[in-house]
Amino acid sequence: MKKSVIALVVVAAAGGGLYFANMQAENAIKQQLEQANQSYRDMAADGEMPEISLSYQDISANVLTSSYSISGLAVAMGEMGTVATADIVQMKGLQPQGLSDSGSVKISGIKAAAAVLQMLPPQTSAYLQGLALHGDYDYAYTDSGELMFNQQTRINDEFALNYSFSLAQMQQFWQFAKEISALPPEQQQALAADEAYVGQMLEKLATGALKNGAISIENNGFIERTLALMAEQGQTPDFATAQGLALANIAVIEQIPADMKQSLSDFISKPEKLSLSFGFTEPLQFAKVQSGELAEHMVSPEAMIKFANVKLTAN
């Protein structure tokens, strides 16, 4: 019996401790949002930007999984009121104050608010009202100095822009970033406007190198639908005419290799997916780019394409 009571006490204490830790994490995020709003108010008062403020419906945190979420996020701008909303922002591996070696952010359901829609022509307003923007971002840093990050931005299920990059020799930059992120938010905001800080950051970044990367566009009717609306309003030619003009322009560009021209032409003729990738035999050191040591590889588009081993494929 005593053992059961002790076990219950331990479980209750652990549960209470977890609840308190989660509440503290939620309060830290709320404080950061309020500090961001105060910073926006200060900059608006100084005439540096319009008056912007952030609000939310709910914030939750789970310190065991290092995950946080902000529901019902809204962005307001001065007298216009709410201009954009997001259903939910989910973060994992991120710290309210500090920089973890891996993390991710997912934003779902970004939409234009009524204050924006009512300012637009009826057709444009109806079109924009049917669009929802979604974003996924993640990064990872390893002890070997490699930093990898990926992002996907989607519009409904009609369009996606994806990219991923891998960098090397990022130890100095990452250490600098960790030190800065450990500072209080107000101190970080002050440093962002400090030229000396920006110079230090660029100096640390120059010690790194770019290994490889990829960018892709996926289209499922979004380009056609957007051009149709713009053509209806007299802003652009119709889709078929725009296709013809684009194909004619590609045909006369001499600096692009024939296989890349073909890929571009294939995508324009049937806009489904266009992918570009590159990778260096040895990581491209930013310091060498700055110093001009790699000038021989930058003399022409052809030289750059060969140096970076650029590949372009369609559909």
Positions of PLM-derived features:
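Positively charged n-region of N-terminal signal peptides that target proteins for export
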Residues: 1-4
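Glycine-rich, small/hydroxylated-residue low-complexity segments
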Residues: 7, 12-315
